[in-house]
Amino acid sequence: MADLSSVDEFLNQCKQSGDAAYGALRSVLERLEDPNTRSKARIFLSDIYKRVGSSETSLQTYHFHIQDIYLDQYEGFQSRKKLTMMVIPSIFIPEDWSFTFYEGLNRHPDTIFKDKTVSELGCGNGWISIAIAAKWLPSKVYGLDINPRAVKISWINLYLNALDDNGEPVYDEEKKTLLDRVEFYESDLLGYCRDNKIQLERIVGCIPQILNPNPEAMSKLITENASEEFLHSLSNYCALQGFVEDQFGLGLIARAVEEGISVIKPAGIMIFNMGGRPGQGVCRRLFERRGVRVTQMWQTKILQAADTDISALVEIERSSPHRFEFFMGLSGDQPICARTAWAYGKAGGRISHALSVYSCQIRQPNLVKIIFDFLKNGFQEISNSLDLSFEDETVADEKIPFLAYLASVLKNSSYFPFEPPAGSKRFCSLIAGFMRTYHRIPINQDNIVVFPSRAVAIESAFRLFSPRLAIVDEHLTRQLPRSWLTSLAIEDTSMDKSDDQITVIESPHQSDLMIELIKKLKPQVVVTGMAPFEVITSSSFLHLLEVTKEIGCRLFLDISDHFELSSLPASNGVLKYLAENQLPSHAAIICGLVKNKVYSDLEVAFVITEVDAIAKALSKTVEVLEGHTAIISQYYYGCLFHELLAFQLADRHAPAERESEKAKSEEIIGFSSSAVSILKDAELSVTEIDETSLIHMDVDQSFLQIPQSVKAAIFESFVRQNISEAEVDINPSIKQFVWSNYGFPTKSSTGFVYADGSLALFNKLVICCAQEGGTLCLPAGTNGNYVAAAKFLKANVVNIPTESSDGFKLTEKTLTKALESVKKPWVCISGPTVSPTGLVYSNEEMDILLSTCAKFGAKVIIDTSFSGLEYSATSWDLKNALSKMDSSLSVSLLGCLSLNLLSGAIKLGFLVLDQSLIDAFHTLPGLSKPHSTVKYAAKKMLALKEEKASDFLDAVSETIKTLEGRSRRLKEVLQNSGWEVIQPSAGISMVAKPKAYLNKKVKLKAGDGQEIVELTDSNMRDVFLSHTGVCLNSGSWTGIPGYCRFSFALEDSEFDKAIESIAQFKSVLAN
């Protein structure tokens, strides 16, 4: 320890080396930290200053330098005018860079730091932290630096200015000293504040912005005893941080901003020094893409420090098109690149660069914090794609809340939960809430049915009611099947005619012309919109209601063009009418949501009806025809509705008293007879009872954990802006996918069609089959949703018997026997994985089946939607089989990216279409196409699969291992409970026959008493559900008499509950 009684002895020790000088100064600091020796130590520092003065030569002689920094040169400044500061060679030495930064701080209002909690990043010798405390009287200033020696010198400087030359405390106007206001800590950026949960109100930073010319040096362990050269470079250069801004030397600033977002209070301000070398646009974008508003407080030019090596910037220019901005001297006004500046500097010239001080505030801070909190938990790589910069504030107000909501969903949920196919309950509730709050229409979520799009809603309604004659607004016919628009079967529209043919007449958009057509043609269904001038009042709508009711016609009124998602929606006569009158039973409202500020192609639609039977029938129809509505679309628009409702006080107004419908039309068209039959028998999702109590083993969705890489792809698809067409062109990825996984060849003439799921694509193929007079051949043991859909679409369906000895798979014998008596056969084969049995077709089996189909001239649909999770290695190679076939054989490949990519409810259906079907398929335009964000995410996930990314492949392997283990466990429980089980080899489902239960009488609870029920295929599902709370599919759904389907890709605790409930079911026999 240095002898404090002798200045000479102290100085002699300092002369020896920088390390010796630092050791002597540390001993002084120890005395300063001790209240008993503090005053004497401060006087000792004064004596040293008097001896060495402020000459810069002391830095070479004694390895330290003491200087005065003058804070304010103007009159009226009441506080201290100067600080006395010490520096040593191994820390950042105050120069133009930091003086300009302080000038920028001075340009803020005097209240900027008053009573605030402040942190300075890269405090160096602490002079700015101390100056802030001296001038603006903050509550606390935390000076942080990664250089441990800088922190020690900062503490010395704090005591040097907190006490006077006589060792007495210097008090400010609030009777506090600098020691009350300032603390210094060793910290990598804001690590100290984050670890100690310190919430900041102001963050200031004067941070290095040039990459170290020797990157390896930055990876050394930082210790107080490291070499002076290393510690000096640590204070003057930055290392690579893993951000895109690294290419400009701004990676450390980028990390500082992101760390700042996590610890700053919502109304907080961050102030940074920004060297203009990368260009002002690059500097501003660093902040703006992170959701930070930027104000330039001060800009000047400064000379580049002579000891700063800019060779790293020269290397960046060499390997990229970017050019940095330097100037020749302070007076130069034409920028030069880093290479020219480097050469000019080497030749003795002085180079300068712009220097700006930016004041930054987070837009929508609480939401942006949620986004960054999500990113830092394993999604840091997405940060480089993040773009929260918006020229239009209304766009920011829409997108940022959604990103925060999506981040919360992905962070807090390991999987996407089951949602009713006709719309998530939350989304329907939000729509109803919006209608009640903004339009005073007292409806609830049960009056809302959600569809993927307006076009799908209209087509679904037609298929449910099967009108022989309909009139449709000319603006709404574009997405209808061409056959409906070209049929001329309008002569006889009597109620007892066959309802197979739908004829649509196109009508002018104007309501008086529409009404004239309705009166003359007397259609059974009318679908129309309204002109802008007609929707202002309710008279046109009222007229339409009266005319359609009079002739017994159903009316679907489209209000999509007039429905505003706004806190001040424009007047709407239709909604005014509904606020005062109940919607008549023959009418329904269709609304397509397309008016968002961000995604013009993101659509979801809903239908409002106040007839419970119609709401239920439409709900079942959308499930049969579409399977589901994309959950992301519901999340997006649900977020918009939520934003409009969140600030409202609930139930401020009593529900409106409305006029009831006076008389109902007697002769109005009902559901088609075939639709009624199919919807009654189809085992669709159970949604009528309390959802929380149900365990869904009856859905084709995985509820297993979604991998981080998949969540990353989903989130990245939304955080990016200006995504190019090539990045959402999924055709090349699908071509590679079907080739790599199934050996399925494609040609230039092959068609590629996409939808929100595979069921919608399958249904279009069914319609193609029906239009050419074909027969759809489905094996017994086909997914029941497909069978129900085909029958609903009135296709000619032939069931091909299968045998339990073959695992209910197709064989050459069963297929040949079936095709011998069928004209124009279309054969649908589920494979490699068969749904619902979970068995797998081998290459040899597929070769035989394709040969058999070719022999009979059958068109083939291979459905791969349930494949990709085979328990043992299965490699399909259809190329060899197809190469042996006649070129006239039509084979199309259907699939869905969900199970195989572990993406849960995020689905993309694809159809690789044989050339012979392309023209026919495109006469059926009403497909709900996947949104560009879904395509982007799917393409990223397919790339992970193709590149064999280890994290993704590990997740797939773990999922397969989980499913295989569950299949064994479920089989064991079922067998022990009297079930006959077909052991699966792949996928998420299995089939089992309740051998011990079928045709047995059991007693079940019925209200307050009991009833005796005989268990059959037709009631097995209901009985099992009522006794166990588990939803399964019975033999009526599987097509295999007696065999029920169990889907076991449940969340862990749900699976355990299901196992327990299944085991308890055998107790019904005890009755």
Curated annotation (Swiss-Prot):
Record key words, sorted: Acetylation, Cytoplasm, Methyltransferase, S-adenosyl-L-methionine, Transferase
Protein name (Swiss-Prot/TrEMBL): Methionine S-methyltransferase
Protein location: Cytoplasm
Family: Belongs to the class I-like SAM-binding methyltransferase superfamily.
PANTHER family: METHIONINE S-METHYLTRANSFERASE
Expressing tissues: Expressed in roots, rosette leaves and cauline leaves. Expressed at a lower level in developing seeds.
Keyword Methyltransferase assigned: yes
Subunit-level organization: Homotetramer.
Domain of life the protein comes from: Eukaryota
Chemical reaction(s) catalysed: L-methionine + S-adenosyl-L-methionine = S-methyl-L-methionine + S-adenosyl-L-homocysteine
Keyword check for Nucleus: no
EC number assigned by the record: 2.1.1.12
GO molecular function, one term: pyridoxal phosphate binding
Free-text function comment from the UniProt entry: Catalyzes the S-methylmethionine (SMM) biosynthesis from adenosyl-L-homocysteine (AdoMet) and methionine. SMM biosynthesis (by MMT1) and degradation (by HMT-1, HMT-2 and HMT-3) constitute the SMM cycle in plants, which is probably required to achieve short term control of AdoMet level. Also able to catalyze the selenium-methylmethionine (SeMM) from AdoMet and selenium-methionine (SeMet). May play a role in phoem sulfur transport; such function is however not essential.
Organism, scientific name: Arabidopsis thaliana (Mouse-ear cress)
Entry-linked InterPro entries: Aminotransferase_I/II_large, Met_S-MeTrfase, PyrdxlP-dep_Trfase, PyrdxlP-dep_Trfase_major, PyrdxlP-dep_Trfase_small, SAM-dependent_MTases_sf
GO cellular component, one term: cytosol
One Gene Ontology term from the biological process aspect of the record: biosynthetic process
Record PTM N-acetylalanine, positions in chain: A2
